[in-house]
Amino acid sequence: MSEMTPREIVSELNRHIIGQDKAKRAVAIALRNRWRRMQLEESLRVEVTPKNILMIGPTGVGKTEIARRLAKLANAPFIKVEATKFTEVGYVGKEVESIIRDLTDVAVKLTHQQAMEKVKFRAEELAEERVLDALLPPPRDAWGQAEQKEENSSTRQVFRKKLREGQLNDKEIEINVAVPQMGVEIMAPPGMEEMTNQLQGLFQNLAGDTKKKRKMKIKDALKALVEEEAAKLVNQEELKEQAIYNVENNGIVFIDEIDKICKRGEVSGPDVSREGVQRDLLPLIEGSTVSTKHGMVRTDHILFIASGAFQVAKPSDLIPELQGRLPIRVELEALSSNDFKRILTEPKASLTEQYVALMKTEQVDVQFTEDGIKQIADAAWQVNETTENIGARRLHTVLERLMDEISFDATEKAGQAFVIDAAYVKARLGELVEDEDLSRFIL
């Protein structure tokens, strides 16, 4: 789990996301509170529940991007889901409990990677010995049995030195390696994913572990053997227990598009994918026990962050019980022309930086001037105002249109330089931006 302070979390998010300080602060505090809770005594820790967050804001302002970046910072089990993918229990479609099952799978994978990293050094030593055994097979006695190998023999040490220096990387050897188990694909109706997973696991266990002699280069053999030896050093049962503990205490679920499951007042009749899904989410957010293939998982201390544009529906259209379980409300602001300008230049691996790097692979030098960047930002903002406001995603559309000619002819224009200034942008986009009908279809 991340031990970063709220200020450090906000600072890290600022490297990738422009503006939206309120949302960043709320997320940073929620993430830090996970760490604070773990420092409490057991009796008090059980009572401290996470304060779930509802992020409200138009499309393309950074809600999903905050979730993506948070996943990398959290160093904890994290899953992002779309609320529209789920249906009420009893109907065809995914049930909301599959969120926790998927989160547990993520936790098992994360815990497995961490455990493998801890034993990596020892696994590398064991893999090295197996490669040396293949290079220098121990002599056999009269009964055909391999004699005790001499660990410190001069020949073995010479080969060990060469192996570590990479001099033997391309030499081929024959070794016994575990054969990857064949995947058994089972077709099942929607909603039966858990049973399908259990059956697949059963068939794979029946196959058992088999080894096969393979000829491979030493560098590939070392990689395969390190993984094999590391897997032997890891206790799978302990790993599952640790993963479930991680989910229950540090898990974070990000539910996007929650406004799409609001029941609008004028709609009547059965509403499979809306109010029913909200009611199914209630026990998960409030705290319940979900059965997964790794064991039972309690959701009492999992942090839920929901987000939605709420352009048609309002947060008050959510059922009251769900509103009460999302106590922290954060509004994200629409982006201005100045925000667009900052988005184009300030974040790490900004859009302009990406295009410059892509063209450099073709030996084409592209430079964006300050007035050119301002013109791009103004064009994107103007199109958003006159047509549908899709936020920062409009920059992708505008830039693709702007760079279309250079990208297409880049192979023939190697060694040339292009300056993207205000005049260049106006020449390529001016007419499209001015004509509202053209903007609707092209930008």
Curated annotation (Swiss-Prot):
GO BP annotations listed: protein unfolding; proteolysis involved in protein catabolic process
The encoding gene: hslU
Where on this chain does ATP bind? I18, G60, V61, G62, K63, T64, E65, D256, E321, R393
Q: Which keywords appear in this protein's UniProt record, sorted alphabetically?
A: ATP-binding, Chaperone, Cytoplasm, Nucleotide-binding
What species is given as this protein's source? Vibrio cholerae serotype O1 (strain ATCC 39541 / Classical Ogawa 395 / O395)
On the tree of life, the source organism's domain of life is: Bacteria
Q: PANTHER family from the xrefs? A: ATP-DEPENDENT CLP PROTEASE ATP-BINDING SUBUNIT CLPX-LIKE, MITOCHONDRIAL-RELATED, ATP-DEPENDENT PROTEASE ATPASE SUBUNIT HSLU
CDD domains attached to this UniProt entry: RecA-like_HslU
Its taxonomic path starts at:
Bacteria, Pseudomonadati, Pseudomonadota, Gammaproteobacteria, Vibrionales
What GO molecular functions are on record for this protein? ATP binding; ATP hydrolysis activity; peptidase activity; proteasome-activating activity
What does the function comment of this entry state? ATPase subunit of a proteasome-like degradation complex; this subunit has chaperone activity. The binding of ATP and its subsequent hydrolysis by HslU are essential for unfolding of protein substrates subsequently hydrolyzed by HslV. HslU recognizes the N-terminal part of its protein substrates and unfolds these before they are guided to HslV for hydrolysis.
Q: Which family does it belong to?
A: Belongs to the ClpX chaperone family. HslU subfamily.
Is Hydrolase tagged as a keyword?
no
* The keyword DNA-binding belongs to this UniProt entry's keyword annotation: no
On subunit structure and binding partners, the annotation says: A double ring-shaped homohexamer of HslV is capped on each side by a ring-shaped HslU homohexamer. The assembly of the HslU/HslV complex is dependent on binding of ATP.
> What's the protein here called?
ATP-dependent protease ATPase subunit HslU
